[in-house]
């Protein structure tokens, strides 16, 4: 049996947007609350998701979820609700996360996100939805992150 400490990644995703709405605070404040919680719990890394709705889904893609729980009728509208951060915001979260002694990463869902995250993330995490997207995986792999 290996005697090593597990590396614990706190998956922030885009969940903080709902928390921000519920608490009437900015998404950036909510994301920092999540980072604080992860740090206090002893996590090693805070992981986010970076995308723009325009780059990952058609504006006409219908909802595939239970509309009684999430009334948003298109995938585009749902993703648009959670894509408000820009490079400056992610940089602020990166610095905040590092100041807490944790690694920072964000799953890029498009080439532009992969590019602007390059000097921020400690490593890339590929989304399961992109596992068959070999050109995108190769593009990220060429960046040489370990």
Model segments located where?
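Catalytic domains of carbohydrate-active enzymes, especially glycoside hydrolases
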Residues: 30-51, 120
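Active-site-adjacent beta->alpha loops and helix N-cap segments on the catalytic face
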Residues: 6, 86-90, 113-116, 126-144
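Catalytic beta/alpha-barrel core
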Residues: 79-86, 102-110, 123-133, 146
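Conserved, mostly hydrophobic/aromatic
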Residues: 11, 38, 117
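Glycine-rich, proline-tolerant flexible connector loops at the mouths of alpha/beta enzymes
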Residues: 16, 44-84
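Hydrophobic faces of well-ordered beta-strands that scaffold small-molecule active sites
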Residues: 8-12, 46-48, 104-107, 124-126
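Short, acidic/polar
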Residues: 24-38, 108-114
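N-terminal small/glycine-rich loop or linker at the start of catalytic domains
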Residues: 1-22, 65, 72, 76
